C-alpha cells in the first residue's frame, strides 16, 4: 500500500513538472531517524519535490553527522540540505511534521533552519529529534542560539544531556566549534566567551564543564 501510494504521488508530481526526491536521497535522509520511523520518513520524502537552491544537482551535502541514540541505534544525517522548503504543513501527520522539521533544520538557509528549530521547540520534541537541535547549537547564527537558549533555559534538559553523554565527542567538538565562531564573529559584542549565549547554552542546558 505504501509503495502504491508513493508511486501515485510521484507520478502526480512528475505531471505537475516536479520531480520527487530520488530513492537514494530518500534512503540517505531516512538514515537520520530510528528504523521504526522509516515508513514515515518515506512518506515525508515522497511529498518533497527535488527543487534546490541555485538549482544545484544534489539534495544534500556528502558530509554526514553521526549520533548514537540511547536505545543503541545509530543515526546519520547530512550537514546541509539544499532542497527548497515549501511543503504545506497540513499534508503531514504530527510525526511526519516533526520529521520534516528535523530535515529542514539542516537547510543551507539560516532563516529556514531557525523556523524549523523554533517549531521543534514549541513543545517537547521526541528523543530522536534532539540530535538535530543539538547540532544547530554549534553553528554561527547567533539568533538561533538565542532562540534555543530562550526555550531551554527554563526546561528540564535531561534528555539533551543524556544524548551528549552517549555522544561525548559531539559535545566536545560542538563546544569547541561554538567557541571558535564566537571568536571569529562575536568577540566584538561579547568580550568574554562566558557572556556569549552559546557558552551559556552548553554550560547551563547541556552540563558542559571546562
Model-assigned labels for residue ranges:
Residues 131, 137, 148-151:
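Helix-rich alpha-solenoid scaffolding regions
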Amino acid at each position: 500500500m505504501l509503495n502504491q501510494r508513493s508511486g501515485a504521488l510521484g507520478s502526480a508530481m512528475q505531471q505537475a513538472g516536479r520531480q520527487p526526491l530520488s530513492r537514494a536521497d530518500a534512503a540517505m535522509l531516512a538514515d537520520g531517524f530510528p528504523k521504526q520511523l522509516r515508513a514515515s520518513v518515506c512518506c515525508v520524502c515522497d511529498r518533497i519535490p527535488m527543487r534546490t537552491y541555485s538549482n544545484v544537482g544534489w539534495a544534500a551535502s556528502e558530509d554526514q553527522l553521526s549520533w548514537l541514540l540511547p536505545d543503541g541505534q545509530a543515526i546519520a544525517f547530512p550537514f546541509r540540505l539544499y532542497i527548497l522548503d515549501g511543503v504545506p504543513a497540513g499534508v503531514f501527520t504530527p510525526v511526519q511534521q516533526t520529521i520534516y522539521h528535523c530535515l529542514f533544520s539542516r537547510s543551507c538557509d539560516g532563516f529556514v533552519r531557525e523556523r524549523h528549530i523554533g517549531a521543534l521547540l514549541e513543545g517537547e520534541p521526541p528523543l530522536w529529534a534532539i540530535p538535530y537541535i543539538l547540532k544547530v547549537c554549534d553553528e554561527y547564527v547567533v539568533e538561533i542560539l538565542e532562540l534555543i537558549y530562550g526555550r531551554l533555559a527554563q526546561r528540564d534538559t535531561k534528555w539533551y544531556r543524556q544524548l551528549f553523554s552517549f555522544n561525548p565527542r559531539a559535545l566536545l567538538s560542538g563546544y569547541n566549534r561554538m567557541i571558535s565562531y564566537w571568536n571569529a564573529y562575536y568577540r566584538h559584542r561579547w568580550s568574554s566567551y562566558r557572556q556569549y549565549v552559546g557558552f551559556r547554552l552548553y554550560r547551563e542546558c547541556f552540563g558542559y564543564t571546562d
